[in-house]
A protein has these predicted regions:
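N-terminal targeting leaders characterized by basic, low-complexity, disordered sequences
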Residues: 1-6
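Extracellular/lumenal and peripheral-membrane lipid-interaction modules
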Residues: 7-241
């Protein structure tokens, strides 16, 4: 009967409920994938070394150990530019790749950037630091860089009235979210200080090669203020009774 059919309720199509949790999970997954992609891209995007003075240039390299020794003997100050140090490194160090990547990595080189201290939120100027950079090529023309920050700190030795203690910390004066110090870089990606333990093996042989020079500076007690682009070594302060 048509009247009975009209009186019957029409079937209601069941609606799919809006899933807030499902959409949040989807967006969270997309965000994680985007973050991973960015990390991979940044780690394989090398920092620019074309603007690094003296990098890979052996010509006219200064004899830094000799110049430093003369300054110590004369109780005089001496200053080296990035170009001076990088030419010296290019002429004196011959880095080699070891391990699993040895058959892929070629033409490694070492350079240094000198960063002056930056102004902190409280108005104080942070310590200057040096950035040791290792550059190598993998494959046909794929350039890769890693770097390690070294910040020098000096204080008077409480056990030896005439001595100065020098130590180096593996970070610069920049911080990541949470106040974590930046210890170095992989490509253009800043790496927290705590993760530098994974990069230290790449720098150990390099640091060992220059231990005599490092010890000469430490034993002399010379100050090591670092300004933008320059390493300044100053005679130790005379302590009076």
């Amino acid at each position: 009967d048509p009247e009975e059919q009209a009186g019957q309720e029409k079937p209601v199509r069941e609606k799919t409920p809006f899933s807030l949790i499902g959409n949040l999970i989807f967006l969270f997954t997309i965000a994680i994938l985007a973050a991973i992609s960015w990390l991979i891209y940044s780690s394989w995007s090398p920092q620019n070394t074309a603007d690094l003075p003296g990098f890979r240039q052996k010509e006219n390299a200064p004899d830094i150990p000799k110049i430093l020794k003369q300054a110590i003997n004369r109780d005089a100050s001496v200053s080296f530019s990035e170009e001076d140090i990088n030419r010296y490194l290019a002429s004196s160090v011959h880095p080699q790749q070891h391990g699993a990547l040895a058959i892929f990595a070629t033409n490694p080189a070492v350079g240094i950037r000198l960063h002056g201290g930056k102004e902190q939120p409280d108005g104080a100027i942070g310590e200057g630091c040096m950035e040791i950079i290792i550059e190598r090529y993998t494959g046909i023309d794929s350039r890769q860089t890693i770097s390690l920050f070294l910040t020098p700190f000096q204080s008077m030795d409480p056990h030896n009235y005439m001595a100065v203690q020098t130590r180096f910390e593996f970070y610069n004066d920049e911080t990541l979210p949470g106040g974590i110090h930046v210890g170095g870089t992989i490509g253009s990606l800043s790496v927290p200080q705590g993760y530098m333990i994974f990069l230290l093996p790449a720098f150990e042989n390099l640091l060992q090669a220059y231990l005599p020079l490092i010890h000469m500076i430490e034993e002399s007690g010379m100050g090591i203020p670092i300004s933008e682009g320059r390493l300044n070594l100053t005679p130790p302060q005379k302590r009076t009774l």
